[in-house]
Amino acid sequence: MLTNTERVKVLSDVTILQKFSSRIIVIKYGGAAMKNQKLKDHVISDLVFLSFIGLRPILVHGGGPEINFWLDQLKILPKFENGVRVTDQPTMDIVEMVLVGRVNKDLVASINKQGGKSVGLSGKDGLLITSRPSDKPNLGFVGEVQNVDTNLLEILINNNYIPVIASVAADKQGQSYNINADTVAGEIAARLNAEKLILLTDTPGILRNASDATTLISHLSIQEARDLTKTAVISGGMIPKVNCCIRSLAQGVASAHILDGRIDHALLLEILTDQGIGSMLVV
């Protein structure tokens, strides 16, 4: 939790309150910040604090480690292709039970415990997300976002609730799909014209040298990000995250951020300080 001194400092900065009052921020939550209880507590307290000072946060989550744990308990061997979980029907059943029934409700309870008001959802609720199959049929029930309906989200955030969304949705026939949580967050941010899309990761951000954290690129445009991808400065698992940011920016999101979720209070440091701590992408 923030100290009283830190809270007073933020709350006394009228420019911050004016700048962000009623603005929507969509946060994709994953990585070490989900596995480490101390980091988890900090993320939750940051969310609640941001809602207290007038922002309207929305949390989107996956839950890979928890899924793997329960697959192991049920003697189901996880399979991956190029880092993407191959999702047959038994795996899809576990994914949905774990993300919607366990991880999501644990996050909701944690937010409520720290003084916020939260509602847990999946993409199925209120037709929030309509899915379609991935263009890679060998991945099984891995889906893409076909449509986003934000009516339910708008009702919730306009009444000071913090929506927590599991990245599971269904197609028009009712078949469940496992969708990348970055993608879900980006599409929701775009549809809501969010002020910020924030991806919490296990890296400092976009680095010129992947092995040197001091080479962090703190600010870049869409074109600069594309150029860095062409020259392989942006590579591997960072490519889909950057592409997600680019898509959301192209659809009206004001800024997209890739942060190190292993840093205490990473959200507040990025949003409420001039220098930030991660990589910010803008149009």
UniProtKB/Swiss-Prot annotation:
Signal peptide location: none
Residues noted as binding substrate in the record, renumbered to the chain: G63, G64, R85, N178
Gene3D superfamilies, A to Z: Acetylglutamate kinase-like (3.40.1160.10)
Recorded GO CC terms: chloroplast
InterPro entries: AceGlu_kinase-like_sf (IPR036393), AcgluKinase_fam (IPR004662), ArgB (IPR037528), Asp/Glu/Uridylate_kinase (IPR001048), Glu/AcGlu_kinase (IPR001057), NAGK-C (IPR041727)
Domain of life: Eukaryota
Catalytic activity, EC: 2.7.2.8
Pathway per the UniProt entry: Amino-acid biosynthesis; L-arginine biosynthesis; N(2)-acetyl-L-ornithine from L-glutamate: step 2/4
Role according to the record: Catalyzes the ATP-dependent phosphorylation of N-acetyl-L-glutamate.
PANTHER family, alphabetized: N-ACETYLGLUTAMATE SYNTHASE, N-ACETYLGLUTAMATE SYNTHASE, MITOCHONDRIAL
UniProt protein name: Acetylglutamate kinase
UniProt gene name: argB
